[in-house]
Amino acid sequence: QHVRDSIAAANEAAYLAQLEIEREQAVADSLAAIGEMALDSARLEKTYGYFAAAGVGVEEQFAVENEKIRLTFSNKGGRVCAAEMKNYTRYDSLPLMLFADGDASLGFTLFTSDNRIISTKSLYFEPIVSKTDEAQIVTMRLAVDADAHIDFIYTIPNDDFMTSMEIKAHNMAQYLSPNTSSLDMQWQSLIRQNEKGRKFESRYATLNYKFVSDDMERLSELRNDSEKLAGKVRWVAFK
C-alpha cells in the first residue's frame, strides 16, 4: 500500500508540474501574441497614419448587375475589379469581359496632413449598396473615424452600359493636406483579346482622350504610338 501511495503521489506531482508548464507556456504565448499585435498596430500607424484602421482587412468581392452589364467590386481599393457585357460573347462563346480581376488596377494618391503619401489601392473600404427607381448605387467608404470618410460612389443605371463614378469627402479637411485640391489617379488596364484575329484586333486598337477645352484626340491605330499629356483631360477611353 505504501508503494502504491508513493507512486500515486509521484504521478500527481508530475501532473501538477506539467499543468504549471502548460500554464506558463499559455501566458508566454498570450504575451507574444499581444506583443505581435502591438507591433502590427505600430507598423500600420507608421505606414498609414490616420488610415491605419483601413490598412488591414480581408479582400471581399461582390457583383452588381443591370440588364446590360455585370460589375464586380472589391472592398480592397474600393474599385471595380471586373466588368462583363451581358447578352454578348467572345468569338469562342465565352462571356465578353471588358476586364477581369488582375487585368486592371485603379488607385488615388492621398497626401495627408501628417505628411504621409498613401495609395487607396492598399486600403480596405466599407461597401454600401442602395437602390433608386432609376439605378443601383454602390458607395465604397474609406473611413477615418465615425464622422470622417471618403466615398467612391458608383451609379449603375437600370438599363444602360455607362456607369458613373464620383468621389466625395466628408469632414476630411483636418486629415488631408491643406494643399489638396485634386487627386492623382493611377489607372492601368490590359486590353483583352476578344476577337479571333489578333492581328485584326491590334490593327484597330487605339486610345482616345479629350482635353477639358479641346476636341477629342487619339493615338494611331496603325503603328505603335504614345503621348505624354501635360494638360488636364476630361476623359480617356480605349477600344
Feature locations, PLM:
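Soluble non-transmembrane domains of integral membrane proteins
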Residues: 45, 52-239
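Long, low-complexity, compositionally biased polyampholytic IDRs enriched for Lys/Glu and Gln/Arg
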Residues: 2-38
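Accessible peptide chain termini
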Residues: 1-2, 239
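Short, Gly/Pro- and small/polar-rich lid/capping loops
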Residues: 26-61
